[in-house]
Amino acid sequence: MARVFISFAMEDKSLRDFLVGQKRNARTSIDFTDYSVKEPWSSSWKTNCRQRIKTCRGMIGIITPNTPKADGQLWELKCAIDEGVTLMLIHGYNASERKLSTLPTVISGRQVNLWTEDNIVNFLNRLG
């Protein structure tokens, strides 16, 4: 089972909870160990967060209209890129009016996938 860091804007915590809930559903093939940060840490959170990200096989970034203002999430995404952690971005919402038209600089040019079981399972399978 792959160890995965889930990056999300704190305003989108319910989406992270939903993704973790999907893996608990016996009818899905989604299986991973959630290593996301659930609560903001103290002033040393970046050091702790970087260590946690480095120990993961991959990161799933949940991208929503809250992402551009989410300094912590943007830092996590940049950290994963800098550390060479395999990254998959998914839209938090599949409705076109809730998708970002312009991605933040740190992830500009990267593909943002639809949030589907197949996309997530394929990503997890690539992690080994």
Question: Can you describe what each PLM-predicted range is?
Answer:
Residues G58-G61:
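Inter-motif core of Ras-like GTPase G domains
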Residues R24-T28, C79-L89:
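Arginine/glycine-rich "motif VI" loop of SF2 helicases in the C-terminal RecA-like domain
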Residues M1-T55, G92-Y93, G128:
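Conserved N-terminal substructure of TIR/SEFIR domains
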Residues D118-G128:
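A charged, well-structured terminal subsegment
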Residues S108-D118:
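Short acidic-hydrophobic, aromatic-tinged amphipathic segments that line or gate anion-handling sites
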Residues A95-G109:
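Glycine-rich, charge-decorated loop segments at or immediately adjacent to ligand/cofactor-binding or catalytic sites
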Residues L87-E97:
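Short beta-alpha junction loops
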Residues N66-V85:
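Conserved TIR/SEFIR loop-to-helix hotspot centered on a Trp-containing motif
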